[in-house]
Amino acid sequence: MRFFYNTYNAEKQRGIMSHVNFSATQNSISNSRVYNSETGGWTTTPKNINGNWNAFGMFGFNTALPNKKYTINSFSNANYQNNVAYLTSGKGADAVERKNTTTNLTLGERLNAAYRNDWFEFGLNGSISYSIEKDKLTPDNNQEPYTFSYGANTQISMPWNMTLSTNIANQSRRGYTDSSMNRNELIWNAQLSQTFLKGNATVSFEMYDILKRQSNIRRSLTAS
């Protein structure tokens, strides 16, 4: 199920956008693991399970100030995930299979402000994301991590059709049970581009993570 609403006032350069989405999966597959006392081994069987669903919502607003050279925008979002799976705890004949549920609520907000004229643009931005992660059967996995960042960007357009743009942001992670993930990263990117052939061709030189501070970390929360 999805719902969209968008509107834009060209005269005021003001726009609103919103989006709500809900999805649920019927008869998902989860592996059931049962101990066989006769053989001393385990039997793993795929079984249907219900309870996997996700809800997402976002709201965005952007507008120019009266002189049209300054703009501000805001982007808010919320996401809730409910995951289920069969989980076996215990050893041997004492093993018990139960239905486990993990939930993850994430709230986010991003703000931007910018100034621009014919040849120069400068912007400031900040964002925060906060999560509540819960595991019903293994509460030691529960945590409430959050990330926040703040930075600036600029772009200069030169008369000979050359453009220099750069952005820098300090990104921070906190609240993780794994202390190695709680860190600060200063990320700096830059790009130089030249347009020629009457605007029909462009050559760009781009540099990402110039300070070599960014780490590639991906996390997933499952019920199994």
Q: At which residue positions do the language-model features occur?
A:
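Exposed, low-structure sequence patches enriched in small/polar residues
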Residues: 1-224
